[in-house]
Amino acid sequence: MSVFFFKFSTVLYLCAAVAYLAYIIFLKEYICRVALTAASVGFTSHTLALVTRYIEAGYTPVTNLYESLSFFAWIIVGLLLIANLRTKIKVLGAFLMPISLTLMLFAYALPKEIVPLAPVLKSFWHPFHILFAFLGDAIFAVAFCGGIMYLIQERQLKTKRIGAIAQRLPSLNALDDLNYQSLTWGFPLLTLGIITGAIWAEYAWGRYWNWDPKETWSLITWLLYAAMLHQRLTVGWRGRKAAIMSIVGFLAVLFTFLGVNLILPGLHTYAKWQ
């Protein structure tokens, strides 16, 4: 049953992504409402997929790459729905939904069988670690989209070619604020994710830090965002610099999440292609 809900939500995310892109092109408000409805129903179906997966498996269903990709996509869509309530940046869905859809399609190609839980994952700290880590990463996805929108808007304003996208994008100040707010929320969550992961590692392997490739790249990503926040607060990094760094930071997030799992050997072998 969980796989059915997963597939249904994937179809709805596809519809939402297409509708959001159509909203940018045709500038019709009803298309935006269609996109939001598809995303909302898809999120509900996705929630049911996670709940039924938990019931079927008997443990927190974020233990392999299929489940991790699905969970990451679910959080991103959830943040989009929250952002739709708290901000007026309706066009954000045109950038976030394709990310979630890509994650879902990647997950769709992976084995979906439920397997016995690896002993290392039988930890009190495991659910907290994954929740904090994925929440932080998803918020950085919002900052990534904000950075892309900032660069697009800045270029169109400089060239004085105000196209369909620019007409829907918020002001540069609003996008810069979105970037900063995402950073101030995402960085503490990433920090908590690393701390809970270290505590979990001590219980699982007897050491808080093992310099595993995943741990090393998590630290690199943390240092990147720490530098961004420091430069923002002390030097006043704003605008274009902040936008570019948010894009670079999220690419580091993706490499830490996917690249390390699939390319580099380490303790996180349970998160590989399986």
Summary of predicted features, one role per range:
Residues 1-274:
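Polytopic transmembrane helical bundles with strong interfacial aromatic enrichment
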